[in-house]
Amino acid sequence: MSIFANKTLMITGGTGSFGNAVLNRFLDTDIREIRIFSRDEKKQDDMRHEFQAKMPEAAGKIKFFIGDVRDLASVKNAMHGVDYIFHAAALKQVPSCEFFPMEAVKTNVFGTDNVLTAAIDAGVKAVICLSTDKAAYPVNAMGTSKAMMEKVIVAKSRTVSPEKTKICCTRYGNVMCSRGSVIPLWIDQIKAGNPITITEPNMTRFIMSLEEAVDLVLFAFQNGVSGDILVQKAPACTIETLAKAVTGLFAPGHEIKVIGIRHGEKMYETLLTNEECAHAIDLGNFYRVPCDKRDLNYDKYFKDGDTQRNVLTEFNSNNTELLNVEQVQQKLLSLSYIREELEARKNK
């Protein structure tokens, strides 16, 4: 029996890479229904046909709702009878959010508030929200909007009993081969015979697979306390290492062209800030950051400061385990997307 036996799970932004990974893992189980909520009817239609072909007996458990997290009414309309929500809807492209920051605010901040408001009103038992390492010490509009999203999540968690609705947040780094990520772009550049373009060779980034992203959300679902932020102890690599790993698999010696840092990018990313590390709880492969449960009684703040602090300091993509080219290639070869692309290239 699965953890979602006879339950209805709703995924906002569900036609994306994360939603596809959840469907692949849980659709053919004893889950009652997986509800996909998103804006794009074409992507919904593509997903419908894909799973009808891939899992014909289980595909009927997917229900599609067209709507926008910015529109509270459409969110509420999709929420009836939902037990759990994975909130993945977001604007996540750093450059576009730099040029249209208010669009990022509308989706990532107001949209999240709408999802949580509707979930609480509908009696949803648990909401797990997906955030990003760019929310820690943000320097760009996307990261800033996600940082505000996290504040909304923590604030909402204080207003509702966790027995009624548990609200948690997961924060993770780059998900390899997810929609809009760099590896599929590089593979397309290799196919076209063009140099692959990298921003800055020494830039470091956390890397994880889609399966690991789902694992993190499931860990939060099963182990998180309302108001928590949970992160995985992910490894990292330099952009140059990642580029050499990809070209080594697809086209050894292929040209790598440095184009410089884009709008809003940092040299390294942070999964846990120094302040969060002070009270983070080590859970093996994960860290749990509990929210501050104190209220607005400021006298209490002066009396009850941080009485217990960890020695753990900032957890970032420079001080985590840094993988070499061979180690990154091993992670890449574990991905079905990479194996399929390599097979197609071999059969050309």
Segments predicted by a language model, with ranges:
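Hydrophobic/aromatic anchor residues within beta-strands of the central parallel beta-sheet
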Residues: 64, 104, 167-170
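Conserved Rossmann-fold NAD(P)-dependent oxidoreductase catalytic core, especially the SDR/UDP-sugar
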Residues: 87, 91-147, 151, 155
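Conserved Rossmann-fold cofactor-binding substructure of NAD(P)-dependent oxidoreductases
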Residues: 63-84
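Strand-loop microenvironment adjacent to phosphate/nucleotide-handling motifs in alpha/beta enzyme folds
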Residues: 3, 151, 155-348
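Rossmann-fold scaffold of SDR-type NAD(P)-dependent oxidoreductases
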Residues: 12, 79-88, 129
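Conserved residues in the N-terminal Rossmann fold of short-chain dehydrogenase/reductase
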Residues: 38, 65-66, 106, 200, ...
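Conserved glycine-rich Rossmann-like NAD(P)H-binding loop of the short-chain dehydrogenase/reductase
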Residues: 30-43
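N-terminal Rossmann NAD(P)H-binding glycine-rich loop of SDR-like oxidoreductase domains
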Residues: 8-29
